[in-house]
């Protein structure tokens, strides 16, 4: 997380310092963040972990796909390097292993709740990326 925050600060400094400061998150960033916060504070640990997994997994997949295509002077290369790197891949693999272990050692009902949380977080992740791509903002 520390490396990610440093990377984001560096990217903003290099490429967005001339843009007006955005004081609030986009609609789906706001909703997704609140969903994850709610899961982390109210759900069983197994369900909370399941809700976090799609974010890491998607970033890993996007990083690996982007890392496979080398583009000279890519302004996103540091981002690609972070999310396609060995350290991040190990973190994701560890998270997935933990998620699988939690699922194997819990009740059927909790497994169903884990699946629902994973599916909802995956939907949120997709809408987060779509919203960024379409530059969605609050309509009112």
Could you say what each language-model-derived stretch is?
Residues 8, 36, 95, 128-129:
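Generic structural hydrophobic/aromatic packing signal, biased to beta-strands
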């Amino acid at each position: 997380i520390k490396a990610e925050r440093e990377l984001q600060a560096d990217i903003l400094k290099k490429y967005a310092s001339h843009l007006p400061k955005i004081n609030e998150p986009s609609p789906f960033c706001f909703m997704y963040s609140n969903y994850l916060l709610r899961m982390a504070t109210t759900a069983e640990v197994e369900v909370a972990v399941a809700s976090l997994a799609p974010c890491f997994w998607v970033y890993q997949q996007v990083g690996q796909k982007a890392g496979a295509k080398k583009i000279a002077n890519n302004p996103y290369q540091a981002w690609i390097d972070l999310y396609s790197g060995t350290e991040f891949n190990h973190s994701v693999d560890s998270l997935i292993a933990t998620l699988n272990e939690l699922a194997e050692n819990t009740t059927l009902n909790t497994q169903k709740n884990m699946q629902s949380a994973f599916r909802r977080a995956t939907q949120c992740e997709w809408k987060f990326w779509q919203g960024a791509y379409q530059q969605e903002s609050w309509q009112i």
